[in-house]
Amino acid sequence: MCIFLLNDIISLEKSITAAALAARKDHRMKDQLTFLATGDVGLYRDNFFEYFVNVRDYFRSADLVFGQLESVLSDRLELSSCTRMGCSSRPECLEAIKDAGFDVLSFASNHALDYGRTAFKDTLKYIREAGLYLTGAGENEEIARQYPVIDVEGTKVAVLGYGSILPQGFWAEEARPGVNPARGITAYVPVEHDQPGTPCRIYTFPHPDDLKRMQAQVKEARTKADIVICSFHWGIHFKEAVITDYERYYAHFAIDAGADLVIGHHQHILKPIEVYNGKVIFYGLGNFCMEEVMNFKRDQELKGQDMRTSKSHREMTAISDAFKTTTRSFPMDSYLTMVAKAIIKDKKIVGVSYLPAYLPVGSQTYLCKPGDERFDEVVQYVNKITAAMDLDPGIFKVEGDEVRII
């Protein structure tokens, strides 16, 4: 049964060809390609197309666009016992996501099984049927490890997806649907080991089995593709600047195994940027198109509670003092965002930059322009958090409406 399912999925994904990309993008013969990546996308209103009015034309001019899907897409919802804050949307939102220019979605989210296995499988099915590439999740462990290798004008790009923020039972196993895992292990070590009750240092490490599998997958992808991109749903949400140890380990090991670019998401705020061995790591791309919490109407009805008054929401807001001063659902730095950009030439990444962006009231994200105070705010914020993690923001150079990294 599993073999037939895997073969059907591979056949369906192979039918999504470069010709399908060209049908909705302005592809011309050119000497370089553009890859774009965003953080979390979670849509919760009637007119889904409204979200992308400010970025649609730019995204459709790119050759390949990646996004992180943050919500379950199904009308068959039953809250999982592990769900903290359920996130769902109607499957029709994929029409707007595709129309906006997205080509690849990771579903390696901590919300992937918020509404159980049926809704999870519905989401996978709808993504594939929409003609979008899927990475990071599957109907079982073998399928969850599959990743698309996309032929873009003769350049093959592999996009691998992993999830680290995994409630119990959310990672895929041999006969269990779920996320392709890149779990972390936490150790708490007392600062003064001889005095019980003293504060502790926190260390995190990659799960050894997941790390080995990730390295093997990247090495395998290296033999199939010209460009290998790794996507991780990881980190600590809402905690300014902080990068955990396990994130750095996974990112560095991925690059050592052959990855050309690492992109992170989940934290709902921007995180630092690192250049390691000449390769760029975006530790967190932040929210890209996320509806305000008070508008998660269907999820609140299913839970029978306003999310903002729930215990899980109170626990989340305790992580950051920024929740105390915000005038919106999330801390104000959650609305500073970016689009990661890579230029590919002669089957290599020859340049990486980011485009400052902002998520305003109304959730219609726009790209900032030089002279816009939000442009400067994003640039200064990224410089600050990067320096806070002992990384070098001095390499970032503003060039027109983007910030060059390499």
What does each of the following model-derived ranges do?
Residues C2-I406:
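Acidic, metal/ion-coordinating pockets
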